């Protein structure tokens, strides 16, 4: 069998995959079934493997397949049925050319009587789901995680336009936590966004304490990260001012298989004690009766570039799905997450200059554990009706030691959350317009018990459950959310009006003071999304939506400068355009957020700070282009860039009026080049951001403790090279890379945490990746 040859036409540009056959080349093999085993992944790669395996000629327009994914192929197939299976969900269909040759073409648009109900707006985060979304939305998939050597959610999120995910800092200065902010919102513990995993709330108390000091999600168990910055608040909440982030877990394989991966990284110029390693494993498949299951594991061991940063994370999941027929589908998810980490803490300017890798806080340590159980059912009797119901239960412990001035504290906190969400969607026609009406309801009940024990720092003794305590509170919330929307397709227009209504009742009992406090409030959230198709590959979108932030347990009953604490409220506006012809993918959007009644908690003195009104305006844009469409010389070379301008201002009258919201760089973006010749992959990437401030006063001069002062901007570069050994070697893939090539010195600050100060950024770091499939 001779090597695969690639040809191109100039108009339109075409990739032609040809394979010379053995002596039987003159015969047609399309009528004979053969055993095939092709793993899910890139559609281009899957088609290439299938052509090589089955011995046929396939002419492919590169713009049709670029960027698309395939579910793989396992079993006995003739050529045509195998191609159809590989193309499932791609929007393409196979066309015979005769003489054992085939080509691909776009599948015809569905007729009105063939419209299919969507139901879940997030869905599987497919390319078409993103393209048809009437708002800013980006999905980063598993194959993209490795390009920059990412091992944490922070590293992936930080490359999305409008998202700022700083280095671990403050009480979230460990990999069990998550810090990110969208469009200038404070990134501390990611409390301004709705964060989900397969549609299930990630926070241990979604309404009463949404801060992700414990974020029980691991990158190794994910297929994709879906970030909906606008146009999703009518379906998802609360805390939706900063959009919706959904972590999509790995799909259950169609056929039984084992996949494993590992990455190790080392920062030679730092004081790293042990190389940091991350591991992931998936074992599972689907039987002929429609029952499938998969065991997922992701683990982390080692330390970061600073002293006192040792980390251990174990994240185990069991996913199951049973589809006895095309009408009924059952699914379940079980998770056990357990981790612990030392926290290096912030440094003063003097300590940073002496040794930026050191830690001056030997007692700070965090640990947490979460158990999750979810069960879902889908009933879809035909393509026009769909009913879903999902129930879930989580039990979470988060605890740790923290030095707070003259005391060392131990703060065990337990949380229990129960929820259920039925949803129904139906399509019907009214004249020339197609309507998909969705209606849903979510009930969520959460309860908490928080303690804080202490000992004197001077004693050098860590507190325990028998030590004195100064906090003993029990809190709870009952939340009801109803939503109704109508997706109207008429001509080239898609118009979706909707309404979400939330009713929340929360309480807190303080056993020390003997007080009982309650709050009850409603939040009506109207929304309107509009999408217009200029062509099949180019659309315009606009939307406006209401969103809100809940009254948190720490805010109940506390008087603040502006009066009694009220729910945070915001109104978001978006206008943008999206283009995707296969070779060029581009998006540009403008946004405006008017955010009222905004509050932040100060951990150093247990107070609530009223920032009041803030206004967030800006531009987000990104593009990816395949240079092979210009000339065959640049085949397999693609470039990409993203940029976000964010102007987040305090608009509350007072001394800080007009100042920038803390931790909101005005300019931020990425650049990169990918080159894939044959089995090799070469990646060059960079990210940059401008300066920012740490406090509402926008203090420029640095304080001695390092907590305030301008935070300088920076630009970092990374590179990676990988080789895919192919299916003959269990799809072994090995890669070597480096982060922060030029060893740029940069840092972030923590302002209102007990372990505030300067946190050094990641120095030059070498890493190695390996993965295989059986």
From Swiss-Prot:
A GO CC term assigned to this protein in UniProt: transmembrane transporter complex
Span(s) of short sequence motif TonB box: 56-63
Signal peptide range: 1-33
Keywords: Cell outer membrane, Ion transport, Iron, Iron transport, Membrane, Receptor, Signal, TonB box, Transmembrane, Transmembrane beta strand, Transport
Subcellular location(s) of the protein: Cell outer membrane
Motif (TonB C-terminal box): 757-774
Keyword Transport among record annotations: yes
Topology class, membrane: Multi-pass membrane protein
Start and end residues of each TBDR plug domain: 129-250
Short name of one Pfam family: TonB_dep_Rec_b-barrel
UniProt domain TBDR beta-barrel: residue ranges: 255-774
InterPro entries reported in the protein's UniProt record: FecA-like (IPR049654), Plug_dom (IPR012910), Plug_dom_sf (IPR037066), Secretin/TonB_short_N (IPR011662), TonB-dep_rcpt-like (IPR039426), TonB-dep_rcpt_b-brl (IPR000531), TonB_box_CS (IPR010916), TonB_rcpt_b-brl_sf (IPR036942)
GO molecular function: siderophore-iron transmembrane transporter activity; signaling receptor activity
GO BP of this protein: intracellular iron ion homeostasis; regulation of DNA-templated transcription; response to iron ion starvation; siderophore-dependent iron import into cell; signal transduction involved in regulation of gene expression
Induction, as annotated: For induction, the TonB and the ExbB proteins have to be active. Regulation by the iron level mediated by the Fur protein and induction by citrate plus iron suggest that the Fe(3+) dicitrate complex must enter the periplasm where it binds to a transmembrane protein, which regulates transcription of the fec genes directly or via a further inductor. Induced 2-fold by hydroxyurea.
Record-stated family: Belongs to the TonB-dependent receptor family.
PANTHER family attached to this UniProt entry: FE(3+) DICITRATE TRANSPORT PROTEIN FECA, IRON III DICITRATE TRANSPORT PROTEIN FECA
Assembly: Interacts (via periplasmic N-terminus) with FecR (via periplasmic C-terminus).
Annotated NCBIfam families: FecA_OM_dicitr, TonB-siderophor
Stated role: FecA is the outer membrane receptor protein in the Fe(3+) dicitrate transport system.
Name used for this protein in its record: Fe(3+) dicitrate transport protein FecA
Lineage of the species this protein comes from: Bacteria, Pseudomonadati, Pseudomonadota, Gammaproteobacteria, Enterobacterales
């Amino acid at each position: 069998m001779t090597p695969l040859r690639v040809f191109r036409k100039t108009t339109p540009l075409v990739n032609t995959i040809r394979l010379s056959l053995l002596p039987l080349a003159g015969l047609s093999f399309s009528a004979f079934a053969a055993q095939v085993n092709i793993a899910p992944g890139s559609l281009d790669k899957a088609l290439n493997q299938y052509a090589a395996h089955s011995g046929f000629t396939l002419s492919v327009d590169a713009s049709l397949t670029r960027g698309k994914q395939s579910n793989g192929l396992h079993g006995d197939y003739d050529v045509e049925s195998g191609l159809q299976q590989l193309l499932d969900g791609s929007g393409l269909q196979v066309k015979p050319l005769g003489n054992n040759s085939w080509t691909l073409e776009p599948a015809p648009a569905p007729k009105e009587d063939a419209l299919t109900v969507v139901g879940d707006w997030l869905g599987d985060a497919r390319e078409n789901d993103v393209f048809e979304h009437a708002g800013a939305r980006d999905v980063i998939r598993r194959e993209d995680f490795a390009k920059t050597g990412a091992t944490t959610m922070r590293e992936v999120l930080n490359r999305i336009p409008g998202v700022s995910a700083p280095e671990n800092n403050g009480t979230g200065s460990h990999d069990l936590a998550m810090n990110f902010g969208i469009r200038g919102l404070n990134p501390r513990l990611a409390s301004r966004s709705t964060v989900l995993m397969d549609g299930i709330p990630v926070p241990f108390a979604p309404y009463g304490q949404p801060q992700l000091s414990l974020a029980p999600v691991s990158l190794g168990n994910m297929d994709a990260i879906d970030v909906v910055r606008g146009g999703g608040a009518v379906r998802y909440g609360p805390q939706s001012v900063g959009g919706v982030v959904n972590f999509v877990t790995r799909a259950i394989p169609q056929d039984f298989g084992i996949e494993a991966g590992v990455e190790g990284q080392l920062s030679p110029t730092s004081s790293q004690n042990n190389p940091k390693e991350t591991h992931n494993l998936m074992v599972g498949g689907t039987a002929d009766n429609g029952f499938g299951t998969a065991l997922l594991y992701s683990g982390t061991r080692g330390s970061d570039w600073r002293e006192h940063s040792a980390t251990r994370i174990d994240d185990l999941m069991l996913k199951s799905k049973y589809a006895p027929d095309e009408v009924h589908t059952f699914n379940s998810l079980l998770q056990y997450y357990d981790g612990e980490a030392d926290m290096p803490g912030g440094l003063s300017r003097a300590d940073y200059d002496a040794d930026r890798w050191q830690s001056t806080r030997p007692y700070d340590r965090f640990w947490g554990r979460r158990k999750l159980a979810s069960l879902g059912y889908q009933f879809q009797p035909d393509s026009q009706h769909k009913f879903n119901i999902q129930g879930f239960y989580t039990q979470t412990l988060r605890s740790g030691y923290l030095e707070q001035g003259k005391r060392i504290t131990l703060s065990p906190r337990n949380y229990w959350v129960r929820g259920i969400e039925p949803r129904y969607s139906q399509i019907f026609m009214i004249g020339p317009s197609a309507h998909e009406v969705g209606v849903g309801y979510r009930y969520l009940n959460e309860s908490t018990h928080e303690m804080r024990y202490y000992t004197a720092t001077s004693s050098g003794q860590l507190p325990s459950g028998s030590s004195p305590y100064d906090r003993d509170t029990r809190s709870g919330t009952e939340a009801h959310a109803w939503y109704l929307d109508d997706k109207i397709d008429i001509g080239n227009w898609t118009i979706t009006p909707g309404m979400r209504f939330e009713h929340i009742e929360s309480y807190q009992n303080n056993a020390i003071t003997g007080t009982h406090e309650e709050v009850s409030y409603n939040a009506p959230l109207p929304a309107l999304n509009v999408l217009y198709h200029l062509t099949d590959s180019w659309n315009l979108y606009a939307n406006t939506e209401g969103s809100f932030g809940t009254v948190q347990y720490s805010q109940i009953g506390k008087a603040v400068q502006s009066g009694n604490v009220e729910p945070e409220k915001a109104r978001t506006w978006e206008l943008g355009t999206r283009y995707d012809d296969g070779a060029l993918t581009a998006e540009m959007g403008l946004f405006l957020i008017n955010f009222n009644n905004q509050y932040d908690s100060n951990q150093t003195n247990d107070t609530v700070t009223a920032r009041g009104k803030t206004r967030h305006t800006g531009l987000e844009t990104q593009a990816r282009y395949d240079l092979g469409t210009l000339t065959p010389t640049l085949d397999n070379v693609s470039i990409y860039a993203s940029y976000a301008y964010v102007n987040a201002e305090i608009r509350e009258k007072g001394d800080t009026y007009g100042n920038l919201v803390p931790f909101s760089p005005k300019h931020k973006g990425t650049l990169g080049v990918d080159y894939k010749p044959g089995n090799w992959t070469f990646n060059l990437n960079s990210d940059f951001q401008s300066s920012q401030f740490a406090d509402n006063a926008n203090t420029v001069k640095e304080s001695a403790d390092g907590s305030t002062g301008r935070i300088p901007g920076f630009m970092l570069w990374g590179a990676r090279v990988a080789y895919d050994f192919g299916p003959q070697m269990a799809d072994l893939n090995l890669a070597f890379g480096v982060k922060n090539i030029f060893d740029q010195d940069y840092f972030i600050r923590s302002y209102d945490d007990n372990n505030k100060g300067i946190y050094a950024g990641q120095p030059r770091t070498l890493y190695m990746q390996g993965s295989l499939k059986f």
